[in-house]
Amino acid sequence: MLYTVGRSPYQCDFNVISKLLARGDDILFIQDGVLAGIEGNCYLSALISCGAALYALKEDIEARGLDDQVSDKVQVIDYTDFVNLTVKHHQQFAW
């Protein structure tokens, strides 16, 4: 399943998200959700331990000036990669 997270980690329940995740799932941080991909974020380690792949949209990272702060555990992707993730997953959930 593809989970798109568009809200700040401080505005949504990441404890619930981490309980839903399984290996093979992908999480894409978009909009203010890219804040969850910052190195040292308290929510990031819980998401990493779930085994899901983590992605963040490059344009949203750049728009917030976070280019050098994204964890190396989060793969930065562009809109073409975003489309490829949506094609890969028949089921999607937006947070």
From Swiss-Prot:
Pfam family, one: DsrH
Source species, domain of life: Bacteria
One GO CC annotation: sulfurtransferase complex
Keyword tRNA processing belongs to the record: yes
SUPFAM superfamilies membership: DsrEFH-like
InterPro entries tied to this protein: DsrEFH-like (IPR027396), Sulphur_relay_TusB (IPR023526), Sulphur_relay_TusB/DsrH (IPR007215)
Keyword list, A-Z: Cytoplasm, tRNA processing
Family: Belongs to the DsrH/TusB family.
Subunit-level organization: Heterohexamer, formed by a dimer of trimers. The hexameric TusBCD complex contains 2 copies each of TusB, TusC and TusD. The TusBCD complex interacts with TusE.
HAMAP family: Thiourid_synth_B
Role noted for this protein: Part of a sulfur-relay system required for 2-thiolation of 5-methylaminomethyl-2-thiouridine (mnm(5)s(2)U) at tRNA wobble positions.
Protein name: Protein TusB
Organism: Photorhabdus laumondii subsp. laumondii (strain DSM 15139 / CIP 105565 / TT01) (Photorhabdus luminescens subsp. laumondii)
